[in-house]
Amino acid sequence: MKSVTLSLLQSAANAFDFGGPVLCDAHHYGEGHINDTFVVWREDHSKRFILQRINTDTFTNPVGLMENVCGVTRHLRAKILAEGGDPARETLSVIPTLSGSTCYLDADGAAWRAYDFVEDTICLQQVGSETDFRTVAETLGKFQNQLEDYPASTLHETIARFHDTPNRYANFEKALAADALGRAKNIAPEIEFIHAREQDCHVLLDQLAAGEIPLRVTHNDTKLNNVLIDAATGKGICVIDLDTVMPGLSAYDFGDSIRTGANDCAEDEPDQSKVHFDLHLYEVFAKGYLSTAGASMSMAEKKSLAWGARLMTLECGIRFLTDYLEGDHYFHIARPDHNLDRARTQFTLVRQMEEVFDQMLEIVCPDNH
């Protein structure tokens, strides 16, 4: 997609019902790497909004994506009102176009959407304290609980087979067989690591197929910075970035949060001796998550959360290594072997999780382990 100029941004902004003319700033807002995000505000500076250009290379059906977002936020708004909450702060509010649509297609066919700006909030880029991590956990658990009765089958799959770990394994095998850049000879230990865990890749989907765990509405990208925290109270109030809300498993959301939050190193740490899975932070997150989501979960589903931590970490490592074999086309790299370092970090975390897996199960399901 072409770069966003101020005139292009203003043209897109003029398509939305902001309640009057708005001013634009062509500087990107936030930490996101997929969509192009900007802040616009009314001419009298009384209100701010988020204006985004959706990345249609990643999300090929923006209209279906916005149907998901509108359906889910409408459902959340009703739940929040019933609980005496403030839906203007506790879920995203979609701004329609002047013609009443949920998104605007510009002259180049690019898709744009707009939200109210949720004021006086912060989002975390890393775990600063146990309290922070528990706050994120409680907010994500509440999000899952509020969507418990949402019909998952009505949602569009915005990224096909996103957390299908066996499919990620199959893609790795194809990349390994092709070995387009001759890199396979450099990664024999990593290849062996993945091959030894082929059966693990099937655990969660096998449990789903057997009816042991339910298909839910899940977020599927539960990074810390996708939870807005009230700047005054420190409480988590709103889950954002709903583009990957799809049918999925609670283990996906739980596991991805553990993968990114329950360790004390960067995702691309080149020194594997510094990589450490923090079982205590895992427990902090698990207790927070289950305090808001656990009432609707069976013993089997609670046990699946521990598997989610293992498999989301393994899956991510497989994706990094696949991209390394294919020439680093998907994940941005800043140095040679960047994706290899990323994969090795994930595999170190998996290995450490395996060593304490009985304890991980005990933490999420103490009554039936």
Give, region by region, the residue ranges found by the protein language model:
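Long, compositionally biased intrinsically disordered regions
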Residues: 353-356
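Conserved ATP-binding subdomain of kinase catalytic cores across diverse folds
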Residues: 25-174, 248-250, 261-262, 266-273, ...
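Conserved active-site aspartate in kinases
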Residues: 241
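Juxta-kinase regulatory segment immediately upstream of eukaryotic protein kinase catalytic domains
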Residues: 1-26
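Active-site activation/catalytic loop segments of kinase-like enzymes and analogous catalytic loops
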Residues: 251-294, 311-330
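Small/polar glycine-rich anion-binding or flexible loop at a beta-alpha turn
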Residues: 302-312
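ATP-dependent phospho-/nucleotidyl transfer catalytic cores
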Residues: 27-31, 52-53, 59-63, 118-134, ...
